[in-house]
């Protein structure tokens, strides 16, 4: 394809835990892929005070988990494309992804964009992990 086109086996949208895991697995399986997302990875993970339910990493802070994700991506030579995808179209035998004037073709698309958050209330961010929680069953024991 030309300068404004690129072809991949897999296009991955999202740089949270699911998108990162998909990219690592694509690399291990020698698939051609592109990872779209934020170079800062997951803001939701970053804001998490303590994550207690991630396999093999009990009691890890969100910022430390993001740091480890970034190190793993670097070790695997996985780059993040920061272009925002504005459309995904099923063309039949492949998918066409649009990002501004650029087009990307992929045999498969993995949408790993996470859950939509609601607007924060005043003081929420400052009190996260100090009484404010997003998981009652996970964090109830702390309060």
Predicted segments with their positions:
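FAD-binding core/adjacent interface of flavoenzyme oxidoreductases
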Residues: 1-11, 80-143
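Cofactor-binding loop segments of dinucleotide-utilizing enzymes, especially the Rossmann-like FAD-
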Residues: 15, 38, 137
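Glycine-rich FAD pyrophosphate-binding loop
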Residues: 28-47
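N-terminal Rossmann-like FAD-binding beta1-loop-alpha1 element of flavoenzymes
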Residues: 9-34
């Amino acid at each position: 394809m030309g300068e404004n086109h690129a072809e991949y086996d897999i296009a991955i949208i999202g740089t949270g835990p699911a998108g990162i895991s998909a990219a690592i697995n694509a690399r291990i399986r020698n698939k051609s892929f592109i990872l779209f997302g934020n170079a800062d990875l997951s803001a939701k993970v970053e804001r998490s005070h303590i994550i207690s339910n991630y396999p093999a990493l009990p009691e890890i802070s969100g910022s430390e988990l993001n740091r480890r994700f970034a190190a793993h991506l670097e070790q695997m030579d996985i780059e993040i494309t920061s272009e925002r995808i504005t459309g995904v179209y099923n063309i039949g035998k492949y998918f066409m992804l649009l990002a501004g004037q650029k087009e990307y073709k992929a045999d498969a698309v993995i949408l790993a964009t996470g859950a939509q958050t609601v607007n924060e209330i005043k003081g929420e961010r400052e009190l996260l992990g100090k009484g404010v929680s997003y998981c009652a069953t996970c964090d109830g024991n702390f309060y």
